[in-house]
UniProtKB/Swiss-Prot annotation:
Source organism of the structure: Rhodococcus erythropolis (strain PR4 / NBRC 100887)
Name of the protein described by the UniProt record: Elongation factor P
Predominant subcellular localization, coarse grouping: cytoplasm
Keyword Transcription applies: no
Known function: Involved in peptide bond synthesis. Stimulates efficient translation and peptide-bond synthesis on native or reconstituted 70S ribosomes in vitro. Probably functions indirectly by altering the affinity of the ribosome for aminoacyl-tRNA, thus increasing their reactivity as acceptors for peptidyl transferase.
Recorded name of the encoding gene: efp
Pathway: Protein biosynthesis; polypeptide chain elongation
UniProt xrefs under Pfam families: EFP (PF01132), EFP_N (PF08207), Elong-fact-P_C (PF09285)
Gene Ontology biological process terms, A to Z: peptide biosynthetic process
Superkingdom as given in the UniProt entry: Bacteria
InterPro entries in alphabetical order: Elong-fact-P_C (IPR015365), NA-bd_OB-fold (IPR012340), Rib_uL2_dom2 (IPR014722), Transl_elong_fac_P/YeiP (IPR020599), Transl_elong_KOW-like (IPR013185), Transl_elong_P/YeiP_cen (IPR001059), Transl_elong_P/YeiP_CS (IPR013852), Transl_elongation_fac_P (IPR011768)
PANTHER family referenced in this protein's UniProt entry, alphabetically: ELONGATION FACTOR P, ELONGATION FACTOR P (EF-P) FAMILY PROTEIN
C-alpha cells in the first residue's frame, strides 16, 4: 500500500484488478476544500491513458514490480528477444509491450525490463542513447522556414528533427523518452 504522498512517476498501482503506471502527478491544495492528487495513469497491458484524481492521504494498492537488467539481442517477427544478464536466459517480449521505445533499440543495448509475476510489463531504455544519422538532407545556410531544424533518419529507422548543421554519418545523443535531439557526440 502506498499513500498519495508516496506517488512518483513510474510507480505501478493495482486498481480494480488492473495494473496502472503513473505517468504524471500533481499535488493540488485548493483555497477551499481538501487537498487532492491529480494523476495521469497508463494501463500497463492495454496502453490506455486516463486521468484520475485521488484525495490526499488515501492509501492505494501497489503492485510488486521487479526490474531486471537485460540486453537487447534482435527483432524476430513481432517479438523482441532480450537476454537476462544474470541467468543468460533469452526472453521474448511482444511489440506491444516494448511499445514506442523500439524506435531507439540497438542490438546489444543494455535495458531494464519491468516484470510482475514474471510477466514483462514494459521496457526502459537508458534516458539518452547514441545513434548514427543514416540519412539527412544537407542544411542550407539561411533556411529558417522549418525553425532551424530538418528531419534525419537514424540507424534504427527512427526519424527525428535535428539542427541544420547535422550531416549524414554524425553520431547524436537522443532522449529515448521523447525522441528529442540533445547534442552531437564527439568521436
Amino acid at each position: 500500500m502506498a499513500s498519495t504522498s508516496d506517488f512518483k512517476n513510474g510507480l505501478v498501482l493495482q486498481i480494480e484488478g488492473q495494473l496502472w503506471t503513473i505517468i504524471e502527478f500533481q499535488h493540488v491544495k485548493p483555497g477551499k476544500g481538501p487537498a487532492f492528487v491529480r494523476t495521469k495513469l497508463k494501463n500497463v497491458l492495454s496502453g490506455k491513458v486516463v486521468d484520475k484524481t485521488f484525495n490526499a492521504g488515501v492509501k492505494v494498492e501497489t503492485a510488486t514490480v521487479d526490474r531486471r537488467d537485460m540486453t537487447y539481442l534482435y527483432h524476430d517477427g513481432s517479438d523482441y528477444i532480450f537476454m537476462d544478464g544474470d541467468t543468460y536466459d533469452q526472453v521474448s517480449i511482444s511489440e506491444s509491450t516494448v511499445g514506442d521505445q523500439s524506435r531507439f533499440l540497438l542490438e546489444n543495448m543494455a535495458v531494464q525490463v519491468a516484470t510482475h509475476e514474471d510477466v514483462p510489463l514494459f521496457v526502459e531504455l537508458p534516458v539518452t542513447v547514441e545513434l548514427v544519422v543514416k540519412h539527412t538532407d544537407p542544411g542550407l545556410q539561411g533556411d529558417r522556414s522549418t525553425g532551424g531544424t530538418k528531419p534525419a533518419t537514424l540507424e534504427t529507422g527512427a526519424e527525428i528533427n535535428v539542427p541544420l548543421f547535422i550531416n549524414t554519418g554524425d553520431k547524436l545523443k537522443v532522449d529515448s523518452r521523447d525522441g528529442n535531439y540533445l547534442g552531437r557526440v564527439n568521436s
